[in-house]
Amino acid sequence: MSNVLDKTNLHELSIAPKISTHDEKLYECTKCGIFFHRDSVESATEINPHENLGEVRAVEDKPNNESIKVDERGTCNFHFIDEHHGKVDGINTEYDASKFKQILENYSKLTEPNQLFECLPSNLRPPSDDEGSDGKSHDPQSNGLGKTDYTVPTIIPPTVLPVLHDLAQQMVKAGHQQELFKTYRDIRRAVLAQSLEKLGVERHSKYDVERMNQDVFEAKIMNWIHYIRISVKLLFAAEKEICHQILDGVEPFRDQSFAEITTISFGMLLSFGYAIAISRRSPEKVFVILDMYEIMIELQPEFELIFGSKPCTEMKEDALNLTKLLAQTVKETIADFEVAIEMDATETVVMDGSVHALTSYVARYVKFLFDYEPTLRQLFQEFNSNDPDTKLKSVMTGIMRALRNNLDGKSRQFEDAALTQLFLMNNVYYIVRNFRREEAKNFLGDDLVQTHRRIVQQHAKQYQTISWNKILQCITVQSSKSGLIKNESIKKTLVKEKFKTFNSQFEELHQRQCQWSVSDVELRESLRLAIAEVLLPAYGSFLKRFGPMIESGKNSQKYIRFTPEDLERMLNDFFQGKNLDVSPKR
């Protein structure tokens, strides 16, 4: 409904003022466009909220040339002279202080949650029972960061607001501004508190928060995010709107009233945020605290607009302080996480050399942080406004370094040096694999990703050296030093010994390393290929050169147990994490 009503609309609503005939001079009410006679308007009749508001008539108004203003002490700055001794054209204009309270109480009802949900953008409304949820992944759009439209709810019928405004002006003129202030504040404050209580807002202390299990903790925070968004964007916005209409021109009571109406409710909302921020920190909490930080950033324009007046300064500062405290909590929690990684002393031994639980946990943790990249950049800008990107990359580098240091310590639990290298290769590669995507490079920096790739290659080469150099020596003949060549012939016994040693060592490697695990298919295949490229040509050359000498004798299969094809097939068993038959299939 428009704030401007013409005379026709007024007559249709039956609240048109009755113009006196003894004075033809009219004045215009600049706020609503209604024309009043300078000396008189019709006094209000009793209000019954169950009857049509059209029966409500305008309250007696008798202004002079001065506008109504109230100073800081609540004192009116004009003199009111009733020339007609309480009568205007025979109409009773005696002031009745109960009308304002009666109408305000009758039309001030709590706003039901469903009404509020209807005022939200569709993507922020609670899902219906049959819609379900599609997971917990963080989506900035779903948290209200996108451009979305909100509809301020109607908390008092628009047709009642001009009536309340006129009554409020009457009370001020009669010198009852303090009664007006107290009546309006108490009624609206109680209704606002009831609306928030019906919505689900409740007070929690730091100790309440620390006793919550993780699921309850997260649910409470997600509810709080919805509550504070609804409260600020809908309830507080609507409250300020009607306050400005009803108490228009009654400064400073208007802003002071709004401040005192909302301060308790807003304080209760913020108290939960403060309780979260100062409660015991843990790495798992950082994501929901980031969600809280995001909503506080999202609501900053509303804080500036809704709490922009001087009486609301403290509320605006409390909101800003909570935002900073949440940012500090996130920063300190991530720093704690880095320390916790390096100090992790879990004795879980990964016997097959596969990815350790700590590695998968850290990688998953950092991947979740990727989803908050814009938020983290903004957050770190509060602490390093010159270069938040460098600070963010430094934090991520510290986490990766802490993980590698811890893995180095855990790798010492293996007695087999080759398994140590395989374990480190697996774990560092797991990080690289999870950080391939472009967002990760932007988040961590390409240098960090490339550094970890080189570390993977180093561990792979060290594994090959430790595992395969010894066996390759069995099938390598150096004529100048070995002493095996004499008169262009090789003694069969020495050749047989070399074959036997090779067979024994390969079977041992096969038996042991087929139980080791390289879970990533790409890494597993590349490692097998690297082994095959060295082993198969060397064995093939040795077999081609010395095989005929053994095959010409008895029991040749005792010494030549494998063909190059057998070795290639058996290499495919490596790193499967299984117990396999080591006998070659001929």
From Swiss-Prot:
The entry's keywords: Auxin signaling pathway, Developmental protein, Exocytosis, Glycoprotein, Membrane, Protein transport, Transmembrane, Transmembrane helix, Transport
Glycosylated residues (UniProt): 65, 106, 321, 487
Record's subunit section: Subunit of the exocyst complex.
Localisation per UniProt entry: Membrane
Name by which UniProt lists this protein: Exocyst complex component EXO70A3
Gene it is expressed from: EXO70A3
Transmembrane segments: 258-278
Disruption phenotype: Alteration of root gravitropic responses (e.g. delay, auxin-dependent root directional growth and larger variation of root tip angles) resulting in deeper root system architecture (RSA) and enhanced drought resistance. Disturbed PIN4 distribution in columella cells associated with a perturbation of the auxin distribution pattern and an asymmetric accumulation of DR5 in the downward peripheral layer under gravistimulus.
Chain segments carrying region Disordered: 119-149
